[in-house]
């Protein structure tokens, strides 16, 4: 096992040499290099560690340079405080995992997620830094864009409420509306799962899959995505888009990745911890909700700065979401039901009225809270239709209520609005068609 040792000058060199010998014996490690992370207290001039030594201005840079020079399978950390702390170690872990190497310490081991290659056609993945960052909305937007441009996409959707066996929905042929979703609900399906949302709103072929659990680096504990990927490979489509779930990453190799993060998130959560790993393996960052009040003043600039510290070359596109009904609402009195925070509901309602000619007489942002949603619906005035996202309780509460009351239920998507987004996504799709050459970025 080709191994990079991480060492520092706070340890007496003979102690480090003895530790390296023991690691080689116990782990079957073959030392190919050492990265010197800093510290001078116990190191003399010209100390010899018996391996090529890589040093830099800071610990993270030393590890990055060593990983670039030497192809290793494991990074063994023999350093400690005060040379490296928790933040530095998470950055080092991200670098190691992105290079395909295990990161091993005295009481921990992180391994890179296992990504399986499914041959057959070009592929993209849309992954996220957490739940409710708009990842599935970006996936749907990407699918529609690719469809318009003649790429003939299929989406493999991974969700916590997906089916026990991968299920194919031909969004273009099926009328995936309220009646269809209610029937799916009666069969015991999670009818607001992401794959129903994508099929209904984007009208592309969608393969629904499930996953449970998510590791620090995004690997699901259990999933049937690999089976879904094989099904997608056999479909009459031209490109496959894999939709992640929360911060979990589809366990398949892809040609290009889009990372979706929310500007409302803590910058440390996006660019620190193993958010840095997600930045390192991605080719484009879409920074959603990049407006006040979701993002406080200066937050977008701070996030971009933090991202640049990890990936200076990664394109970053700030974006906002705006609702788009998939049915005609002009002249209607509607109740708008969403997962959006209360602070932006008035703005979104105004967008619907101005852009689509409806009158929004009631709003609720409690789509993910069934009890509060029920209270909101009870207190609403009479409407012509419920306008709802396909999320959370959209089917079992809102759609069912509409059916019981004899009111129309019209589904609503959220489009990312951002300068340069279409061009960046299409460049990634074309690059995926050429195959991954080893160079990242667009």
Curated annotation (Swiss-Prot):
It is an enzyme of class 6 (ligase). One of its GO terms (biological process) is gluconeogenesis. It is found in: Cytoplasm. One of its GO terms (molecular function) is cyclic 2,3-diphosphoglycerate synthetase activity. Its EC number is 6.5.1.9. The keyword Nucleotide-binding applies. It comes from the Bacteria. Belongs to the cyclic 2,3-diphosphoglycerate synthetase family. Catalyzes the formation of cyclic 2,3-diphosphoglycerate (cDPG) by formation of an intramolecular phosphoanhydride bond at the expense of ATP. HAMAP family: Cyc_PG_syn. This is Cyclic 2,3-diphosphoglycerate synthetase. It comes from Rubrobacter xylanophilus (strain DSM 9941 / JCM 11954 / NBRC 16129 / PRD-1).
């Amino acid at each position: 096992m080709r191994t990079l040792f991480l060492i520092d000058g706070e340890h007496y060199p003979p102690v480090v040499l003895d530790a390296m010998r023991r690691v080689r014996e116990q782990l079957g490690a073959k030392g190919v290099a050492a990265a010197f992370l800093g510290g001078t207290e116990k190191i003399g001039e010209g100390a010899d560690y018996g391996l090529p030594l890589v040093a830099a201005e800071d610990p993270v840079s030393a590890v990055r340079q060593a990983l670039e020079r030497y192809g290793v399978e494991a990074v063994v950390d023999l350093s400690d405080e005060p040379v490296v702390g928790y933040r530095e170690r998470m950055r080092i872990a991200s670098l190691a995992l992105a290079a395909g190497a295990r990161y091993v310490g005295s009481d921990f081991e992180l391994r890179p997620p296992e990504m399986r290659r499914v041959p057959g056609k070009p592929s993209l993945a849309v992954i996220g830094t957490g739940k409710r960052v708009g990842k599935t909305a970006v996936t749907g937007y990407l699918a529609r864009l690719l469809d318009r441009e003649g790429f003939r996409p299929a989406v493999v959707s991974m969700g916590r409420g997906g089916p026990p066996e991968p299920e194919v929905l031909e969004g273009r042929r099926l009328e995936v509306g309220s009646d269809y979703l209610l029937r799916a609900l009666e069969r015991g399906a999670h009818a607001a799962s992401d794959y129903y949302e994508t099929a209904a709103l984007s009208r592309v072929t969608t393969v629904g899959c499930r996953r449970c659990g998510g590791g620090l680096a995004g690997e699901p504990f259990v999933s049937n995505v690999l089976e879904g990927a094989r099904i997608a490979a056999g479909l009459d489509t031209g490109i496959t888009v894999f939709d992640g779930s929360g911060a979990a990453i589809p366990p398949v190799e892809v040609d290009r990745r889009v990372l979706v993060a929310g500007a409302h998130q803590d910058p440390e959560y996006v660019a620190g911890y193993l958010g840095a790993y997600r930045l390192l393996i991605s080719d484009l960052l879409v920074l959603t909700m990049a407006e006040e009040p979701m993002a406080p003043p200066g937050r977008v600039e701070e996030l971009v700065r933090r991202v640049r510290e990890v990936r200076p070359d990664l394109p970053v596109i700030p974006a906002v979401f705006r609702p788009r009904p998939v049915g005609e609402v002009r002249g209607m009195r509607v109740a708008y039901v969403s997962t959006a925070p209360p602070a932006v509901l008035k703005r979104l309602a105004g967008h619907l009225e101005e852009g689509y000619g409806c009158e929004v007489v009631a709003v609720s942002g409690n789509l993910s809270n069934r009890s509060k949603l029920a209270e909101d619906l009870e207190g609403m005035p009479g409407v012509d239709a419920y306008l709802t996202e396909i999320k959370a309780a959209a089917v079992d509460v809102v759609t069912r209520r509409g059916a019981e009351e004899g009111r129309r239920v019209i589904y609503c998507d959220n489009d990312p609005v951002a300068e340069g987004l279409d061009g960046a996504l299409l460049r990634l799709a074309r690059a995926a068609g050429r195959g991954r050459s080893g160079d990242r970025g667009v």
